[in-house]
Amino acid sequence: MALAKTIMIQGTSSHVGKSLLCTALCRIFKQDGFHVAPFKAQNMALNSYVTLTGGEIGRAQGAQAEAAGIAATVTMNPVLIKPKQDLNAQVVVLGKPLADMSARDYRANFLPKAVNLVGQCIEELRREFQVLVIEGAGSPAEINLKDRDIVNMRTAILADAPVILVADIDRGGVFASLVGTLELLEPHERQRVAGFIINKFRGDIELLKPGLEFLEQRTGKPVLGVIPYLHEHGIEQEDSVALEGNKNVSSGSEIDIAVVKLPRISNFTDFDLIGRVPGICLRFVCPGDPMGTPEAVILPGTKNTIEDLQYLKEKGTDQEIIELARKGIPVVGICGGYQMLGKMLYDPWGTEASLESITGLGLLDIETTFFKEKQTHRCKAKITCTELNWCGITNQEITGYEIHTGQVKLGREAKPLLQITQRSGNIVALPDGAVGNQGHIWGTHLHGLFDNKALLLSWVNSLRERKGLSRLTLAKLPDNREEKYDNLAEAVRHHLNMKQLHQMMGLGEGKP
């Protein structure tokens, strides 16, 4: 059986749109009849995705697999690095935590093994699929990191992939960044770059043409496309850079929801759908900044619950949240944020930090103990708590996923929010989450909760009713994932020379 054809998307820097373009290409190749898969050798992110087998990979590769119409596997992102403290990170290998390492430890003790692992995963995927869409990281020309960079040109060589270099014109300096990146590559790496894509363009393309002609003449490499700035693509963004300046991700301000932007916030994609509901203003508020007078507050997940809770207290944000809760403002906690809402958090094995215990916000009658083993599961569940006066979907099935080491014990004044009925494919009956006596403070370990449209609609409508606003219907909620992937593919296909891309990949006429 022939090995899969490959294409690799690299960038001149972080946040130029590599992940989104790879997602679009996965969908385009799927639409064209190819059996396609994504790949990224090593990902550094706090937004992770749980596979059907309970493995943890980068969120972007999970979305790319969805766009490709396949189930994500751990081979699609064999190494995931999750920053835990300023000089320390958890290294996840083939979906399971290996160890906490410093950058120096990683380089000395694991990097050679990682290179071999990447090669094995690429070979496995190339034998299974017809096309492999590979994503790089940051820039391939980071001189100080070049000797330990396994995710860019070293991956391209292992996969025998032509490289498309992408730059973000919206930030300015696009031609300097492309030419400069190319100049800093080794000669054999430069030869592997097959062409360029200019991303996030606004304005008249005619005004850009002299620059495109210069770029092609200077480098001898073609520009395959100029992709417009896609404002409303609706695809989850993995990089926390996406949160910079993101004070309002939805037009309109009937309902104001404040998400606390914890220093080590993880899986902020939990709130993507909320932010696109008509009439909702979703704000990410840094600890220490005024919370204002929101209709609801959300404490999100975090890679280090104890240290982020300490930071909240140092900035006084804990007292602000407590005061809002006392006024009857709904407060929701997801995973680490849920644990923060409790009375006490214990870390006897130093899983999270050197601090053995810390008091929580005391808004829920729960206590959390952190253990060494991490729970990662795809789940099905049912809301069981009748004290939730906003919830009209009791006993309806919802889906989500768990990524946590903390185990929560409920006190007398808290009731379970839901019951997990399926965990990593196994039938179970496990309580999760907690609801306070008055019903407006609640939390859960389940990420992805607000991706369940019926639940989201019920919660949003409860906020609207408190303010005397009319209820929304399901028809008012954003498009589903499949439509988003199709729309993204259509937008990118229209501005990309797919025929030229097929030729670079050796796909001939671009048909299976």
Curated annotation (Swiss-Prot):
Organism of origin: Desulforamulus reducens (strain ATCC BAA-1160 / DSM 100696 / MI-1) (Desulfotomaculum reducens)
UniProt name for this protein: Cobyric acid synthase
Top-rank taxon, per record: Bacteria
Pathway note: Cofactor biosynthesis; adenosylcobalamin biosynthesis
Gene: cobQ
Domain (GATase cobBQ-type): residue spans on this chain: 254-455
InterPro entries: Class_I_gatase-like, CobQ/CobB/MinD/ParA_Nub-bd_dom, CobQ_GATase1, CobQ_N, CobQ_synth, GATase_3, P-loop_NTPase
Protein family (similarity comment): Belongs to the CobB/CobQ family. CobQ subfamily.
Function: Catalyzes amidations at positions B, D, E, and G on adenosylcobyrinic A,C-diamide. NH(2) groups are provided by glutamine, and one molecule of ATP is hydrogenolyzed for each amidation.
Catalytic residues, chain numbering: 335 (nucleophile), 447
Protein's GO biological process: cobalamin biosynthetic process
Keyword vocabulary terms for this entry: Cobalamin biosynthesis, Glutamine amidotransferase
One Pfam family per UniProt: GATase_3
MF GO annotations: ABC-type vitamin B12 transporter activity; catalytic activity
